[in-house]
Structure formats: C-alpha cells, structure tokens
Design a protein with these regions (language model features):
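Conserved ABC ATPase "signature" region
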Residues: 14, 31-40, 97-98, 139, ...
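Helix-to-loop junction immediately C-terminal to a conserved catalytic motif
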Residues: 82
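Conserved ABC transporter NBD signature motif
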Residues: 90-98
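Conserved ABC ATPase signature
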Residues: 168-172, 176
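A short, proline-enriched helix->beta-strand linker immediately N-terminal to the Walker B motif
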Residues: 187-191
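Conserved ABC ATPase "signature" C-loop
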Residues: 247-248
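ABC ATPase "signature
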Residues: 253-254, 262, 334
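The conserved cystathionine-beta-synthase
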Residues: 295-327, 331-347
Length: 347
C-alpha cells in the first residue's frame, strides 16, 4: 500500500454515479435511476449495461486495479474515465476539472500532457524502430526531433531495452514489444497512467517479469494509475486498492488485504477462497492495536508479507511488536502468533 495516500488529499480522479448504457432507451432507464439499475430493467428496455452507477476516487500516486471477468465492464469504465468513450450519465473530474465539459481541443491537450495509455495490443508502428516509436508522441506534441530522440533514449534505458533501440517491432519478443509500449506512454511524462490488460497477451513467465518491471517503475515514478485486469492474482500483486466488477457494478473497492479477509459479497468471496493468504496478507492487516503491556521484545514490520516472517512468528513464545520502519520504527501494533494460525488455517 502506498503510505503517502491520504483521505485528506484531493483526488486526482473522481467519478460520481457514472453509467454507460448501450441502447436507444438508455435515457428512459436513467430517468428513474437512483443507484444501480437491475438486470430485469435492462432486459425490459432492450439495453446492454457497460457501467452501472460507478463512484470512486483515485488519489495521487495510487494504483487502483479494476478487476473483473469478461463483460464485467472494467474496460468500458477505463474508457469512460479517459473519455475514449462518453458515459451516458454521471460526472468525471480530473484534478478538479470536469472531464465531460471539455471540448475536443481540451481533451487532446489533456491526453498529450497528463495521460499515458497502454493497451493489450501493442499498437507499435511496424516501419519505425524502437527509438522512433517511443519518440513519436513527443514529435506529435511538437518537441524538436533531437530533443524527442534524447528523451526517447532515456525511456529505452528506463524499461531495460538498451541495445535494442534500433530494432524493429518484428525483431522483438512480446514482452519487449510491451516494454516499448510502456516506454512510449511514459515519454510524455504523464501524471495519470491508464493500462488496459497490458500483460494479458504474454505467456506466464514473461507476464511475471513485466509485473516486476511495472512495480519497479511505479516505485520510482509514483504515477496515479488505473490498471485493468481479469487476473485476481495480478490485482493482488500490483494494487494499492482493488475494484472488483460484475455486470457493470463495482462489487467491492478495498485494499487487497481487506478483500481477502472480508469479501463483501459471495461473488467476491469466490475469488478469495483459493488465495494463499500467507503470500498476500501483510502483518498490518492482522495485528491488534498497540498495547505496551502486551508488547514482546521481538519486532516485525507492518509491511512484511506473512510468508516472509512466518517461521519467526510461529517460533515465538510471546507476542511480537509491530513497527513502522518508515517512521523511526515506531511501535504501532501487537501480533499474536495464535492469531496468525487462525487467519491462515482457520483454527
């Protein structure tokens, strides 16, 4: 979890009661809507739902992963937030500005200067080299060619493609092509990064490698990110918070730990049942409030994944003191070894 996030921050992205409905009777449906519209009402109206009353915020430096199966509305929601498609109803604000009130010129400027986008299809220009593909949006933006190439070379280094800058897309692997796509989207130094299933076309080993690369980039760049995936394990691995969608509705929006420990609906619970909790949960999610009288002499970081410290926890004959290593090792909680066993094994 990004510790810099604060509920007191003004959100970078704010979404209020967003609907995307396909069909000629969409406006009639919305006349009576005060919340999610039922499947029966959609069927009667002959409409198809894309997004059904979505409201949420994304704060600066946060990675919100929108997860759902095919047809859940996750990609439609991203397209509405980036205004690649217009929502049927609702409000969307980017840094306090109403996205839906912007004209075409303002939208182009916003996308050129504030937004980066990466999609499942690499969409590279086949007749241009890696360097030329990355420099392309900078040249379109109006930067001199020499400056664009210099910046593109920095991006080549950033994503680990040094030595391949003069290759053509056909000479690269799928993972390398997606690195070019990522570099191209970062070249304009966007504040907001939209990624729609960027790794789903890659084989499992390359996918894991790209997830590692993505986390490395985010640790240094601190972008505000909306990331779409159908893979719950990927969502757990990458997200600060996860929004799980079904039939256009956000079923639950919470931290990965809270979703695993406290699924809000039966639908969400199905995703969490087979999750190896020890590989996902952080100590902070299962600790008790700090009480000096119960504190033990051994300490454990609040951000540690249970699996990485399980042996020392289970060998301990006393409680452990949970500390915040980013705040001078301040004690913030108590961890009972018995509670770890209960959380992991239900005993």
């Amino acid at each position: 979890m990004n510790d810099s996030l604060s509920i007191n921050q003004k959100p970078v992205i704010r979404c209020e009661s967003v609907y995307k409905i396909f069909g000629t009777n969409a406006n009639k449906l919305l006349e009576k809507a005060s919340g999610p519209i039922s499947a029966e009402e959609f069927q009667k109206a002959g409409c198809i739902i894309g997004v059904n009353d979505a409201s949420f915020e994304i704060h600066k430096g946060e990675m919100l992963v929108v997860m759902g199966l095919s047809g859940s509305g996750k990609s439609t929601l991203l397209r509405c937030i980036s205004r690649l498609t217009d929502p049927t109803s609702g409000e969307i604000f980017i840094d306090g500005e109403n996205l839906l009130e912007m004209n075409s010129k303002q939208l182009i400027e916003l996308r050129r200067n504030k937004m980066g986008m990466v999609f499942q299809s690499f969409a590279l220009l086949p007749h241009k080299t890696v360097l030329e593909n990355i420099a392309f949006p900078l040249i379109i933006k109006g930067l001199p060619t020499e400056e664009s190439i210099k910046k593109a070379m920095e991006m080549v280094d950033l994503v680990g493609l040094k030595g391949r800058e003069n290759y053509f897309p056909r000479e690269l692997s799928g993972g390398q092509q997606q690195r070019v796509g990522i570099a191209r989207s970062l070249a304009v130094e966007p504040d907001i990064w939209f990624l729609d299933e960027p790794f789903s076309a890659l084989d499992p080993l390359i996918r894991k490698e790209m997830q590692d690369e993505f986390l490395r980039l985010q640790a240094s760049l601190h972008k505000t990110i909306m990331f779409v995936t159908h893979d719950f394990d990927e969502a757990l691995r990458l997200a600060d918070r996860i929004a799980i969608m079904k039939d256009g509705i956000i079923e639950q929006l919470d931290t990965p730990d809270n979703i695993v420990l406290n699924p809000a609906t039966e639908y969400v619970k199905k995703f969490t049942e087979d999750v190896p909790r020890e590989k996902v949960l952080k100590i902070e999610s299962i600790m008790d409030k700090y009480d000096q009288s119960l504190a033990g002499s051994n300490t454990v970081s609040k951000d540690a994944i249970i699996e990485t410290v399980a042996e020392s926890i289970l060998d301990s004959k006393e409680n452990l003191t949970v500390i915040d290593v980013n705040n001078d090792n301040k004690p913030i909680g108590i961890l009972q070894p018995k509670k770890v066993i209960t959380v992991l094994f239900g005993k």
